């Protein structure tokens, strides 16, 4: 059975997790054997979106209905997701990379180390420039912080320079990237991070 790199993708509802997953799956499947697991509380809507967008073949996308608190399924009791990962590994012997998208959650959500090797945490500019300084494990401890929707900064009165300063202060040396996932801005930097930090040979 393969031992793929497992990448957790977290962040609040509407921050752009599924949009990021679409980009990463579409781009990275050209070089790697990729699968994705999505978590929704009561539906498999994110699985449907990913499938409809053509980001990956349908058989490489699995939806997990978590019920209750979405962070429990990625942290305290990750059994459903671990079972889904194992299912994908059995399905695709050559699997090199698997994305696990959490259900929309708050800033305190984190992935269990047994579930994810690397974590990406997505926040968005439209939620206000104060978001980075609010902290929380997703912002301070994720392997890569993705600050999405930079195009909306002028519309919501957010100063990206202030967000950058706050992020540097909250994260220290941990990396972050600004993105506009509508256009794909910043996606290349995220892929480069995953390849380098995840030890993926091109």
UniProtKB/Swiss-Prot annotation:
SUPFAM superfamilies: P-loop containing nucleoside triphosphate hydrolases. This is Urease accessory protein UreG. Homodimer. UreD, UreF and UreG form a complex that acts as a GTP-hydrolysis-dependent molecular chaperone, activating the urease apoprotein by helping to assemble the nickel containing metallocenter of UreC. The UreE protein probably delivers the nickel. GO terms for biological process: urea catabolic process. GO terms for cellular component: cytoplasm. One of its GO terms (molecular function) is nickel cation binding. Its main location: cytoplasm. The lineage of its organism: Bacteria, Pseudomonadati, Pseudomonadota, Alphaproteobacteria, Magnetococcales. It comes from the Bacteria. NCBIfam families: ureG (TIGR00101). Belongs to the SIMIBI class G3E GTPase family. UreG subfamily. CDD domains: UreG (cd05540). It holds the Pfam family cobW. GTP binds at residues 11-18. Facilitates the functional incorporation of the urease nickel metallocenter. This process requires GTP hydrolysis, probably effectuated by UreG. Keywords: Chaperone, Cytoplasm, GTP-binding, Nickel insertion, Nucleotide-binding. It is found in: Cytoplasm.
């Amino acid at each position: 059975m393969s031992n793929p790199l497992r990448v957790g993708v977290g962040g609040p509802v509407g921050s752009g997790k599924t949009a990021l997953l679409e980009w990463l799956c579409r781009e990275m499947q050209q070089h790697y054997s990729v699968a994705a697991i999505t978590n929704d509380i009561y539906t498999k809507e994110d699985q449907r979106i990913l499938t409809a967008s053509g980001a990956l073949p349908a058989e490489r996308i699995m939806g997990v209905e978590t019920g209750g608190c979405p962070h429990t399924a990625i942290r305290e009791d990750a059994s459903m997701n671990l079972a889904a990962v194992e299912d994908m590994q059995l399905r695709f012997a050559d699997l090199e990379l698997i994305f696990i998208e959490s259900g929309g959650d708050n800033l305190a959500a984190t992935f269990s180390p047994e579930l994810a090797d690397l974590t990406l945490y997505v926040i968005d500019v439209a939620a206000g420039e104060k978001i980075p300084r609010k902290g929380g494990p997703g912002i301070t401890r994720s392997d890569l912080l993705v600050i999405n929707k930079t195009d909306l900064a002028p519309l919501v009165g957010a100063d990206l320079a202030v967000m950058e300063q706050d992020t540097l202060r909250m994260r220290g040396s941990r990396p972050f990237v600004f993105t506009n996932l509508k256009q794909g801005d910043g996606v290349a930097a995220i892929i480069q991070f995953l390849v380098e930090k995840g030890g993926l040979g091109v």
